[in-house]
């Protein structure tokens, strides 16, 4: 009897341990399962984001041949050369000028057009479509259109103004001209985001303000701007980042010229890599641009806590 009791006890304990083991395996599988679904994303990010970023850091501290193959490690020598280069500082100045010329007008014009389209007027749908058209045009065809507009002899702009200014060939006007094209390209996206925010403002708020005798400008300042501040923050963020990364229209319209008057940092990176064959210098400049954009982004998110009002 004692032996049978011991056998039964062992069998029960084995069954319990098996159940516990299966339960633990099931629990472990449940916890690990979400990570398996993330593996494809990790592979893609690893191949196309993390690996290129690490390779850029390594190349920025090395010398390379004309094919971009690493020859030897040189530490921070490339950064020292860049930081003592007048061309690099010119690119920094041109980049910040371009960012200011593009970001502020793009946001302001997009907001004013959204205010106009939000009013209940005849033909609003037509206006909305017209304002959205630039968003559907790529930088290459846009550059062709604006090259014709800016043409010094046959361009419609000089014809209207009665001048013969070389908008893209005169260093005084080239950066402004490229900024105008970029603003035009940005307006559509800014418009649609801000118009969406305006349409989400409760009409009761505006009606109450009107009953209280508030002027239109007062309503915009005290009601509209706080209510659309999340969309406004997003639009400002996107426009700043896009302005720092602008390349296509600059390459097609001016190729960084005349002189270096439109040679923004991204175009300087392109020129160093594919014209001068100095991939290490291009990588070093790319990392500096990354740091600048990171600082700008952190400053924006610091401002978000004070200036953005979520409903």
Label each residue range with its predicted role.
Residues 29-311:
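A structural signal for multi-pass alpha-helical bundles of membrane permease subunits
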Residues 1-28:
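Short, Lys/Arg-rich, polar N-terminal cytosolic tail immediately upstream
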């Amino acid at each position: 009897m004692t032996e049978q009791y011991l056998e039964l006890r062992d069998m029960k304990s084995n069954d319990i341990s098996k159940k516990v083991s299966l339960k633990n395996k099931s629990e472990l599988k449940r916890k690990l399962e979400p990570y398996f679904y993330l593996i494809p994303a990790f592979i893609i990010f690893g191949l196309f984001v993390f690996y290129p970023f690490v390779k850029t850091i390594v190349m920025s501290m090395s010398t390379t041949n004309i094919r971009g193959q690493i020859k030897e490690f040189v530490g921070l020598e490339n950064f020292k050369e860049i930081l003592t280069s007048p061309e690099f500082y010119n690119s920094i100045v041109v980049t910040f000028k371009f960012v200011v010329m593009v970001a502020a007008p793009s946001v302001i014009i997009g907001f004013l057009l959204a205010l106009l389209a939000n009013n209940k007027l005849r033909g609003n749908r037509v206006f909305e479509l017209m304002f959205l058209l630039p968003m559907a045009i790529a930088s290459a065809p846009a550059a062709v259109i604006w090259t014709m507009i800016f043409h010094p002899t046959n361009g419609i702009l000089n014809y209207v103004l009665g001048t013969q200014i070389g908008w893209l060939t005169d260093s005084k006007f080239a950066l402004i001209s490229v900024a105008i094209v970029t603003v035009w390209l940005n307006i559509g996206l800014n418009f649609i985001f801000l118009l969406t925010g305006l349409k989400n403002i409760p009409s009761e708020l505006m009606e109450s303000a009107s009953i209280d005798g508030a002027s239109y400008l007062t309503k915009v300042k005290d009601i509209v701007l706080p209510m659309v501040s999340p969309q406004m923050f997003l639009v400002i963020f996107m426009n700043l980042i896009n302005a720092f990364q602008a390349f296509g229209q600059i390459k097609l319209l001016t190729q960084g010229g005349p002189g270096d008057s439109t040679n923004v940092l991204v175009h300087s990176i392109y020129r160093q890599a594919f014209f001068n064959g100095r991939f290490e210098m291009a990588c070093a400049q790319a990392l500096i641009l990354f740091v600048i954009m990171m600082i700008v982004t952190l400053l924006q998110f610091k401002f978000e806590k004070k200036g953005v009002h979520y409903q």
